[in-house]
């Protein structure tokens, strides 16, 4: 039994870093014979707009392409903005026959498969969700960087036998940093007194009576001094970027807040966690067949 042609006019695009090879398949509804038109484009904006014009010339509104690295994203954005439906599929679903691969053949192969509706289209959320996702992923990267810097800072304290981490729960807190600024500027730690440190620490600090013992007699080598100063400066900068990301995430999620705010009622899910979840799966659950696919 012959396969049913689902799309009489469709396009397959083979995506590369600097090159797009597109094939439009035009099928005669009477004879079911398909004619092909091919064209190559570079990936600069004027050429992407020429791709749109070329597709419109043949009244082609359906396009299929591989999810090749990040190279598909500019193509997707331009086609989406011009009302063209795009199916992004994993390369394994449109893999061509070995030893018979060229860009033109790959493009035609994608077109043929798409004509019969064979490729499985990947879930691509709406534009506003995709933009939010880029920010949340960047935020998570920054969180990881800040965590790594905190670990490096603590390692420097350990190597220098500075027991700051045992006194303060947060070595980047105000009291801890006040003490560290003083310690790093001091010529010698052997002559430190409790009076020198008491003014630097919050009066509610529980372990400030042990602070002098945690510091006195420690030896901070020049390399550790340099690292402690640089890490502290970098951590402050990262905190500023994290705050900026949070503000941007809150701003972008406002129009969608009524659709996802109930997620925060679940135990263990904060507002930030809810935003990150929505940025990955969107707010429309009908696109998922079941919970397992989700």
Language-model features: locations:
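A detector of single, family-specific signature residues
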Residues: 1-294
């Amino acid at each position: 039994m012959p396969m049913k042609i689902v799309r009489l006019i469709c396009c397959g695009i083979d995506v590369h870093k600097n090159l797009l090879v597109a094939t439009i398949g035009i099928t005669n509804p009477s004879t079911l014979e398909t004619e092909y038109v091919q064209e190559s484009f570079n990936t600069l904006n004027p050429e992407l707009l020429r791709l749109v014009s070329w597709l419109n010339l043949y009244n082609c509104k359906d396009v299929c392409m591989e999810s090749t690295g990040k190279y598909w994203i500019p193509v997707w954005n331009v086609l989406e903005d011009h009302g063209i439906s795009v199916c992004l599929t994993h390369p394994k679903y449109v893999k061509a026959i070995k030893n018979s691969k060229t860009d033109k053949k790959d493009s035609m192969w994608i077109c043929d498969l798409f004509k019969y509706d064979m490729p499985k289209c990947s879930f691509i959320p709406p534009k506003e969700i995709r933009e939010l996702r880029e920010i949340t992923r960047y935020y998570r990267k920054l969180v990881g960087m800040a965590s790594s810097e905190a670990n490096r800072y603590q390692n420097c304290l350990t190597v220098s036998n500075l027991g700051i981490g045992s006194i303060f729960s947060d070595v980047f807190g105000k009291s801890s940093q006040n003490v560290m600024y003083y310690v790093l500027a001091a010529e010698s730690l052997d002559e430190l007194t409790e009076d020198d440190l008491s003014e630097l620490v919050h009066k509610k600090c529980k372990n400030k009576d042990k602070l002098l013992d945690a510091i006195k007699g420690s030896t901070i080598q020049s390399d550790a001094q340099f690292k402690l100063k640089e890490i502290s400066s970098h951590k402050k900068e990262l905190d500023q970027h994290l705050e900026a990301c949070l503000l941007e995430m809150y701003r972008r999620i406002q129009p969608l807040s009524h659709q996802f705010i109930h997620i925060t009622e679940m135990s263990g899910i904060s507002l930030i966690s809810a935003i990150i979840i929505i940025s990955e799966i969107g707010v429309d659950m009908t696109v998922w067949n079941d919970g397992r696919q989700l």
